[in-house]
Amino acid sequence: LNSPNAVLQHMSIPQFLGKGTPVVFVRKSESDYGDVVRVMTGVYIKFFFKTSKLCVDETVWKVNDEELVVTGGNVGNENDIFKIKKTDLVIRGMKNVYKLLHCRSHLGCKNIGGNFKNGYPRLAAVDDDKDFIPFVFIKA
């Protein structure tokens, strides 16, 4: 049985805010204590499912060879690390707007932007520093 592994983007329409799938941030370093994830700290991102259904064993995000964000990563793999960076954007009065970076070991970081693949809005690692999808975090 093959499970779908695409990480898709909820469109930024007000009625959809907060209806995406919750994620958990797993800190890369055990020396980063507490419940707070600090900006520009290496983290692994994994979907948080409250279910026992099939296809939830691959929940950790990674970037594949096509530069698309997919599941199937591993906590502990240096190539599956993301970072959160604060931006100066203000969206709908919200000042705490962030962008995600994918940081492969020894290759630097790329913004997480978007593209359409097979008709779906996909998250993807992009080279252009000005091309990124802004994120607002909502506690699940």
UniProtKB/Swiss-Prot annotation:
GO terms for cellular component: vacuole. This is Cysteine protease inhibitor 6. Inhibitor of cysteine proteases. May protect the plant by inhibiting proteases of invading organisms. It comes from the Eukaryota. Disulfide bonds join 103-109. Belongs to the protease inhibitor I3 (leguminous Kunitz-type inhibitor) family. It comes from Solanum tuberosum. The keyword Disulfide bond applies. It is found in: Vacuole. Keywords: Disulfide bond, Protease inhibitor, Thiol protease inhibitor, Vacuole. GO terms for molecular function: cysteine-type endopeptidase inhibitor activity. The keyword tRNA-binding does not apply. It holds the Pfam family Kunitz_legume.
